[in-house]
């Protein structure tokens, strides 16, 4: 490997480290926004700020009669989840997924606010009363406490809040037996002139429960978001010293709160008035508390208002989210939209899905994928290796030129350019395959880090390809390395070292010899904290590279080098005349 190749590899690796650690992708600016965004506020008025302990019947005005009652729970089972609904607030109190477990491989409740529930309607009355429907008791005609919905069936349950004659709120949930999506219909009758500002909010409160062992990783991948005007509005409440808030007017495609692998989204079917996002990380807590809300306008000249939505509380699975048809897959972080996202969406995931139809083990799929990439890039690798072999053969002549024209840089560059042209080589040819593969490697990083397909799928000693394949935990962290030893990165570093040893090189100086040892160590440090799937991919990629390079070295030759013009000796410099010399 010549000097330019190594420098390119080192620079690209450094860029990759800086990029992934500090340079999060910027989102496009929102379009068609009527109000300026308000963010990073030190004080935020929560969507509902009446403490439960302080609430009294008088706090609810004409709703006071509904503030006392008996809570009835309804459990709904389908193929994918077990949900628990409550008549107090007509809210969702529990959501346990059947096909996705927590880090202990046990079922868990995704709903953080499992005491009060996650969903509610919020509005102010003309009398100034702040209403959160989770404080009110609804009635329902369903008498069962548990319902199982078959694969081809649906089940609906309606909750009704009768405030006065011809004044009521009706909420209906519709479950399908074979879908994560839940129908959510709202009907408000007789409230045309009763709601302050003729506006109410449908809110999801509390975000979601963390499912992974690494809380820092969960925090890094948890945020609230809204999709408006074809752009993603994102709110990340990672700073404990601040309370975050975003409020935008306009039509929203959805609002959502996510963790690393799961998302809770509200998807309206008609135009909204805007969105509300808020978040705060409490000191000492390993999670962030998020609130997302959709704003709706109640027409003042109509006696009733109806809105149909879909709720999605489930895995961040690209195919499932994409099938909803509302761009909810944009919640997935695949890096830059113009570079890495196309690789992830149109190359990596489709190939993985295709291979998964025939192969059930994702470790084998990753190995086959690495082989396919090497196969596709073989022409580039062949041209690169031949170019480096020619550069190696030209090395004696290049050293001679450098020696003869060391005092004449312009002439030196001219002669080197002539040699490259006559020999038909490109001094940067060794970097080309690496540069072309870097966007794919970046995209692989994002896919392996965020794709739920790899989660809790093992291969060999790795129990989970979405996290590092630790074989020894230290109990403390070593700077730049981490708190564990992962085996795939060690094997990958060895493969990188061997691959460099057999790769033709045009440089033999001490710095280049040192890079043969330094570069594998750099890769080891970087990949030790990466997902095991990524380490496996790059390990096998380098194993295939070793086999490919060995084959090319056996079959390629430099016999096709053309006859080069001889090096012309540099003319001797004329002696300088001394000033004020005496004439003879």
Curated annotation (Swiss-Prot):
<keyword id="KW-0472">Membrane</keyword>
<feature type="transmembrane region" description="Helical">
    <location>
        <begin position="478"/>
        <end position="498"/>
    </location>
</feature>
<feature type="compositionally biased region" description="Basic residues">
    <location>
        <begin position="574"/>
        <end position="584"/>
    </location>
</feature>
<dbReference type="Pfam" id="PF14849">
    <property type="entry name" value="YidC_periplas"/>
</dbReference>
<protein>
    <recommendedName>
        <fullName>Membrane protein insertase YidC</fullName>
    </recommendedName>
</protein>
<comment type="similarity">
    <text>Belongs to the OXA1/ALB3/YidC family. Type 1 subfamily.</text>
</comment>
<keyword id="KW-0997">Cell inner membrane</keyword>
<keyword id="KW-1003">Cell membrane</keyword>
<feature type="transmembrane region" description="Helical">
    <location>
        <begin position="428"/>
        <end position="448"/>
    </location>
</feature>
<dbReference type="InterPro" id="IPR019998">
    <property type="entry name" value="Membr_insert_YidC"/>
</dbReference>
<dbReference type="GO" id="GO:0051205">
    <property type="term" value="P:protein insertion into membrane"/>
</dbReference>
<dbReference type="InterPro" id="IPR047196">
    <property type="entry name" value="YidC_ALB_C"/>
</dbReference>
<feature type="region of interest" description="Disordered">
    <location>
        <begin position="563"/>
        <end position="584"/>
    </location>
</feature>
<keyword id="KW-0813">Transport</keyword>
<dbReference type="GO" id="GO:0005886">
    <property type="term" value="C:plasma membrane"/>
</dbReference>
<feature type="transmembrane region" description="Helical">
    <location>
        <begin position="358"/>
        <end position="378"/>
    </location>
</feature>
<keyword id="KW-0143">Chaperone</keyword>
<dbReference type="InterPro" id="IPR038221">
    <property type="entry name" value="YidC_periplasmic_sf"/>
</dbReference>
<dbReference type="InterPro" id="IPR028053">
    <property type="entry name" value="Membr_insert_YidC_N"/>
</dbReference>
<dbReference type="GO" id="GO:0032977">
    <property type="term" value="F:membrane insertase activity"/>
</dbReference>
<dbReference type="InterPro" id="IPR028055">
    <property type="entry name" value="YidC/Oxa/ALB_C"/>
</dbReference>
<comment type="subunit">
    <text>Interacts with the Sec translocase complex via SecD. Specifically interacts with transmembrane segments of nascent integral membrane proteins during membrane integration.</text>
</comment>
<dbReference type="GO" id="GO:0015031">
    <property type="term" value="P:protein transport"/>
</dbReference>
<keyword id="KW-0653">Protein transport</keyword>
<feature type="transmembrane region" description="Helical">
    <location>
        <begin position="516"/>
        <end position="536"/>
    </location>
</feature>
<keyword id="KW-1133">Transmembrane helix</keyword>
<keyword id="KW-0812">Transmembrane</keyword>
<feature type="transmembrane region" description="Helical">
    <location>
        <begin position="5"/>
        <end position="25"/>
    </location>
</feature>
<dbReference type="InterPro" id="IPR001708">
    <property type="entry name" value="YidC/ALB3/OXA1/COX18"/>
</dbReference>
<dbReference type="Pfam" id="PF02096">
    <property type="entry name" value="60KD_IMP"/>
</dbReference>
<comment type="function">
    <text>Required for the insertion and/or proper folding and/or complex formation of integral membrane proteins into the membrane. Involved in integration of membrane proteins that insert both dependently and independently of the Sec translocase complex, as well as at least some lipoproteins. Aids folding of multispanning membrane proteins.</text>
</comment>
């Amino acid at each position: 490997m010549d000097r330019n190749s190594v420098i390119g590899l080192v620079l690209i690796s450094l860029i990759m480290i800086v990029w992934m650690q500090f340079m999060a992708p910027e989102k496009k600016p929102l379009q068609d926004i009527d109000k300026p965004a308000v963010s990073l506020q030190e004080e935020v008025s929560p969507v509902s700020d009446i403490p439960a302990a302080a609430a009294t019947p008088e706090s609810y005005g004409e709703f006071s009669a509904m503030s006392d009652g008996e809570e009835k729970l309804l459990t709904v089972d389908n193929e994918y989840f077990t949900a628990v609904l409550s008549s107090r607030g007509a809210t969702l109190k529990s959501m346990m997924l059947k096909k996705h477990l927590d880090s202990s491989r046990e079922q868990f409740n995704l709903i953080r606010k499992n005491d009060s529930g996650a969903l509610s309607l919020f509005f102010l009355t003309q009398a100034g009363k702040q209403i959160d429907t989770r404080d009110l008791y609804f009635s329902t005609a369903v008498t069962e406490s548990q319902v199982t919905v078959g694969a081809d069936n649906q089940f609906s349950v309606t909750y009704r809040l009768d405030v006065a004659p011809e004044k009521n709120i009706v909420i209906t949930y519709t479950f399908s037996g074979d879908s994560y999506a839940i129908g959510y219909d709202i009907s408000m009758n007789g409230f045309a002139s009763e709601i302050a500002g003729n506006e109410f909010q449908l809110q999801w409160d509390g975000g979601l429960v963390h499912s992974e062992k690494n809380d820092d990783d969960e925090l890094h991948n948890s945020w609230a978001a809204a999709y408006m005007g074809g752009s993603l509005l994102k709110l990340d409440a990672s700073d404990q010293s601040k309370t975050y808030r975003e409020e935008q007017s306009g039509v929203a495609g959805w609002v959502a709160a996510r963790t690393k692998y799961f998302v809770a989204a509200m998807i309206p079917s008609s135009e909204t008035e805007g969105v509300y996002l808020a978040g705060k990380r409490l000191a000492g807590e390993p999670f962030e508390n998020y609130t997302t809300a959709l704003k709706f306008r109640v027409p003042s000249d109509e006696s009733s208002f109806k809105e149909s939505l879909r709720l999605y509380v489930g895995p961040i699975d690209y195919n499932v989210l994409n099938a909803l048809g509302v761009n909810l897959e944009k919640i997935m972080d695949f890096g830059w939209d113009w570079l890495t996202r196309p690789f992830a969406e149109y190359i990596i995931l489709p190939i993985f899905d295709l291979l998964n139809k025939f192969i059930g083990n994702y470790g084998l799929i990753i190995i086959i994928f690495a082989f396919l990439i090497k196969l596709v890039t073989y022409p580039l690798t062949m041209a690169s290796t031949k170019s480096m072999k020619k550069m190696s053969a030209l090395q004696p002549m290049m050293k001679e030129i450098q020696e003869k024209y060391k005092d004449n840089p312009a002439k030196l560059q001219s002669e080197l350019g002539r040699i490259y042209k006559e020999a038909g080589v490109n001094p940067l040819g060794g970097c080309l395959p690496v540069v072309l593969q870097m966007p794919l490697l970046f995209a692989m990083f994002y896919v392996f880090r965020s794709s739920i397909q790899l989660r809790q799928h093992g291969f060999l000693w790795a129990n989970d390809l979405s996290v590092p394949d630790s074989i020894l935990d230290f109990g403390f962290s070593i700077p730049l390395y981490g708190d564990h030893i992962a085996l795939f990165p060690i094997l990958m570093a060895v493969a990188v070292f061997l691959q460099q040893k057999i790769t033709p090189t045009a440089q033999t100086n001490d710095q280049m010899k040192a890079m043969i040892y330094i570069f594998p160590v750099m890769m080891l440090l970087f990949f030790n904290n990466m997902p095991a799937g990524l380490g496996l991919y790059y390990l096998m990629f380098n194993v295939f590279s070793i086999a490919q390079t060995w084959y090319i070295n056996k079959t390629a030759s430099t016999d096709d080098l053309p006859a080069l013009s001889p090096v012309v000796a540099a003319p001797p410099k004329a002696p300088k005349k001394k000033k004020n010399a005496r004439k003879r």
